[in-house]
A protein has these predicted regions:
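Short hydrophobic beta-strand segments
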Residues: 2-6, 164-167
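A broad, low-specificity signal marking well-ordered, structured residues that form hydrophobic/aromatic
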Residues: 3, 86, 187, 248
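Active-site helix-to-loop segments that bind/position phosphate- or nucleotide-bearing substrates
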Residues: 4-95
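Extended, charged low-complexity segments
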Residues: 243-252
Length: 252
């Protein structure tokens, strides 16, 4: 099984790491091409390009100037312990037993506007560059187009015939994958909550649930669709009436 998730805007470079293990990102050559473009942007340009405040633009301009390779444990940090958003709250990687890290490393991939595709223990430096950013790179009109061939080829290389491919990323990030070119079908779980008597997808809960689904897969060694349907963390249950084919809906 392979799983893809989105990165997070929030980063944590302070928390003590539970392991000294790390790996090298696969696409630093391509990341340097993207970085060269974004490094040239002034704070005001970053603010407009990313629709962020002047304060955030200044922070990310500084990050862009300081970003450099090679990555080492002294100047970079494993991705799964660095991203700090709702998905990562649900995943709670810090409490995954170290003997399960190899399972996480094998199954999980993180889509990224700067790094393309990251393994959990891949080193990364601080950045902010969402996949939907309308920024031409090399011959590509945007980041989706730049990364799509590389990311899709990498996933196909890793996916074995008959293996499940679970999409827990946002639409913005998953659009960097050429679904038609994948050699296996895509399983897409969705998570909905009852609120005021109506079933809704509430962003915070849905993002956290995506992370919890990754954790469930790691905890239970899930391999089949039936295994996925057993997801029951924090009150979610599989809803057979709302689900159809490879679209799995969980409600609570």
């Amino acid at each position: 099984m392979k799983i893809v998730i989105s990165p997070a805007k929030s980063l944590n470079f302070e928390k003590e790491l539970p392991t000294s293990q790390y790996t090298e990102p696969s696409f630093l050559k391509e990341a340097r091409i993207v970085h060269k473009v974004v490094k040239q942007k002034k704070p005001a340009e970053l603010s407009e390009l990313m629709s962020i405040s002047d304060k955030l633009a200044d922070l990310n301009w500084k990050r862009n100037q300081e970003w450099k390779t090679p990555f080492t444990p002294e100047n970079a940090r494993p991705a799964v312990y660095t991203f700090d958003g709702d998905v990562y709250t649900g995943l709670d990687a810090y409490t995954i037993p170290l003997e399960k890290l190899n399972v996480l490393q094998d199954k999980l991939r993180i889509l990224s506007g700067l790094y393309g595709l990251l393994k959990p223990l891949d080193l990364m430096q601080a950045y902010r560059l969402e996949m939907g950013t309308k920024m031409p790179v090399a011959e590509s009109k945007n980041l989706h187009d730049f990364w799509k061939p590389t990311v899709t080829k990498a996933l196909n290389k890793e996916l074995k015939k008959g293996e499940l491919f679970v999409n827990l990323a946002s639409n913005e990030y998953f659009s960097a994958v050429d679904v038609k070119a994948l050699k296996v079908p895509v399983i897409t779980p969705d998570f909905k909550d009852y609120k005021d008597g109506k079933l809704k997808m509430i962003s915070f809960f849905a993002k956290k649930a995506r992370g919890m689904m990754v954790r469930y897969i790691i905890d239970t060694n899930a391999e089949t669709i039936d295994d996925l349907k057993g997801f029951n963390y924090e009150g979610y249950q599989f809803d057979a009436n709302l689900s159809k084919g490879n679209h799995l809906v969980f409600t609570r």
